[in-house]
């Protein structure tokens, strides 16, 4: 077997929860981080980062991408090689778009390639879930598409969620960060039976709405009572952006992951108008946002090896 000297891995951003699917559903989006790992003969660790938020990325052994790389080698009981890591940041940090998942998946996939692919994709996925602590970002980042994850006696059951091509995700990414830890602190530790039933019903409706593209179902399905009512207070202008998105023709708006990015779903004809309305609404409260009409990424993490 020839030794792989370098590998380039491209990993998509992800949006998790989609309203009622708290901690169990996520989708890959056409926004990417690209990382290149190259073996070093001289030893040591070199990390170079490019991109708008490059200064926010650690360039030592605490780097999450590198930690994931080392984790796989520890799992297969091998010593990780010395590497140079080049990171091209396209996914904003701490915005609710799965930046940590791109690092975990990117590091694991790169390590698996440099090690000669000792692990299956399923095994890589299980390692990624263990590192992240929940499946809703790392699974679609690795596999692509929209994915629903549930625990089973054997581990995880992963289900592909059909997504009608006319349902367009519009993301509004503000110029401020919100940590997942902070967003989780505001959540209650217990929920009422009524709220649990509400979310169960709305998640079922969401799955059918995404599969069929039926707007009336999606307008109802995107509601949630388990996390968004508590988290929206952490996002200035949330109500104004929501009202603007719906007025422009969106089916509804949700918090992407832990936030602060806001995600609207719209049909293809309305997506650009929805994007413009969300951007304007945030501007009225003094917040600059990068608003994009995206698509679902159906490939997930991809790698290119060099001998």
UniProtKB/Swiss-Prot annotation:
> One Pfam family for this entry, by name?
GHMP_kinases_C
Main localization is: cytoplasm
Residue positions binding ATP: 92-102
GO CC list: cytoplasm
Which principal EC class is assigned to this enzyme? transferase
Q: According to the UniProt entry, what is the EC number of this protein? A: 2.7.1.39
Keywords (alphabetical) are: Amino-acid biosynthesis, ATP-binding, Cytoplasm, Kinase, Nucleotide-binding, Threonine biosynthesis, Transferase
Q: Does the keyword Amino-acid biosynthesis apply?
A: yes
Q: Which GO annotations describe the biological process of this protein?
A: threonine biosynthetic process
Name the reaction it catalyses: L-homoserine + ATP = O-phospho-L-homoserine + ADP + H(+)
How far does the signal peptide extend, from start to end residue? none
Task: Tell me a Gene Ontology molecular-function term this record carries.
Answer: ATP binding
- Which biological pathway? Amino-acid biosynthesis; L-threonine biosynthesis; L-threonine from L-aspartate: step 4/5
The protein's location, in the record's own words, is:
Cytoplasm
Q: Which InterPro entries match?
A: GHMP_kinase_C_dom, GHMP_kinase_C_sf, GHMP_kinase_N_dom, GHMP_knse_ATP-bd_CS, Homoserine_kinase, Ribosomal_Su5_D2-typ_SF, Ribsml_uS5_D2-typ_fold_subgr
Q: Does the keyword Cytoplasm apply?
A: yes
Question: What family does the Swiss-Prot or TrEMBL record give for this protein?
Answer: Belongs to the GHMP kinase family. Homoserine kinase subfamily.
This chain's function reads: Catalyzes the ATP-dependent phosphorylation of L-homoserine to L-homoserine phosphate.
Among PANTHER family, the record links this protein to: HOMOSERINE KINASE (PTHR20861:SF1), HOMOSERINE/4-DIPHOSPHOCYTIDYL-2-C-METHYL-D-ERYTHRITOL KINASE (PTHR20861)
State what protein this is by name: Homoserine kinase
């Amino acid at each position: 077997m020839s030794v792989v000297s370098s590998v380039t891995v491209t990993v998509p951003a992800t949006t998790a929860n989609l309203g009622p699917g708290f901690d169990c559903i996520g989708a890959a989006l056409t926004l990417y981080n690209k990382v290149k790992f190259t073996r070093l003969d001289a030893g040591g660790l070199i990390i170079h980062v490019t991109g708008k938020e490059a200064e926010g990325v650690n360039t030592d052994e605490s780097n999450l991408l590198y930690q994931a790389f080392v984790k796989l080698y520890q799992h297969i009981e091998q010593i990780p090689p010395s590497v140079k890591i080049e990171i091209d940041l396209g996914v904003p940090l701490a915005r609710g778009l799965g930046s940590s998942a791109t690092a975990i998946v990117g590091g694991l996939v790169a390590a698996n390639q440099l090690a000669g692919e000792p692990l299956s994709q399923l095994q890589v996925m299980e390692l990624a879930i263990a590192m992240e602590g929940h499946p809703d970002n790392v699974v679609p980042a690795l596999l692509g598409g929209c994915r629903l994850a549930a625990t089973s006696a054997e581990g995880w059951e992963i289900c592909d969620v059909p997504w009608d091509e006319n349902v367009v995700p519009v993301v509004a990414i503000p110029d401020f960060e919100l940590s997942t830890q902070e967003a989780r602190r505001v959540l209650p530790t217990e929920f009422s039976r009524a709220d649990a039933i509400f979310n169960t019903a709305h998640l079922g409706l969401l799955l059918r709405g995404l599969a069929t593209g039926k707007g009336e179902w999606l307008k109802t399905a995107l509601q949630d009572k388990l996390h968004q009512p508590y988290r929206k207070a952490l996002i200035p202008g949330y109500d104004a952006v929501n009202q603007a998105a719906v007025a422009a023709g969106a089916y509804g708006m949700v918090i992407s992951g832990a936030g602060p990015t806001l995600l609207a779903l719209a049909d293809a004809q309305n997506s650009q108008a929805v994007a413009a309305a969300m951007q304007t609404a945030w501007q009225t409260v003094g917040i600059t946002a990068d608003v994009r009409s995206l698509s679902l990424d159906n490939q997930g993490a991809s790698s290119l090896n060099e001998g």
